[in-house]
Regions:
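Active-site acidic catalytic loop and adjacent metal/ATP-binding pocket
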Residues: 1-26, 38
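Active-site activation/catalytic loop segments of kinase-like enzymes and analogous catalytic loops
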Residues: 21-60, 72-92, 104-111
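Histidine/acidic-rich helix-loop-helix segments that form or flank divalent-metal centers
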Residues: 60-68
Length: 134
């Protein structure tokens, strides 16, 4: 929603208010695990691999470590997004964003199940029972 094709300098960036120095994988997660679009996991990870190959020209990265960082960064980003969507609903009366929570939560569920070191977060999410609230 925040990128568009322009006559030059593609892509055009419409919204960069969260532009910060952060994890190497943050921008990639933002594009490939977007809160508004469902990408097939196979396509997502192929694009991640393509990015990593290009990155490895400048910085040597282990594939499994990069994928882990990609996934964990996604969990952080998606937890933040769910909070923002909830705030937009309750404070700003923009309930349309609630429609994006199930997709966003699904990303989190997938990753906390994928990695054993995420078991405490997985347990907490089950206790909170966000799914039932959706």
């Amino acid at each position: 929603r925040n990128l568009m094709m322009t006559n030059k300098n593609n892509p055009g960036i419409l919204d960069y208010q969260d532009a910060l120095i952060g994890p190497l994988t943050y921008d990639l997660v933002s594009l490939l695990k977007d809160c508004y679009i469902d990408w097939d996991d196979e396509i997502t990870y192929k694009m991640m691999e393509s990015y990593l190959q290009r990155l490895n020209k400048d910085v040597v990265m282990d594939h499994s470590q990069f994928e882990y960082w990609f996934d964990i960064t996604g969990v952080q980003r998606h937890l933040k997004a769910i909070g923002i969507f909830s705030r937009l609903n309750y404070r700003d009366k923009k309930s349309i964003y609630l429609n994006d929570i199930p997709r966003t939560y699904k990303y989190i569920e997938t990753i906390v199940t994928k990695y054993p070191d995420m078991s405490k977060l997985k347990k907490l999410l089950l206790e909170i029972n966000i799914k039932e609230a959706l």
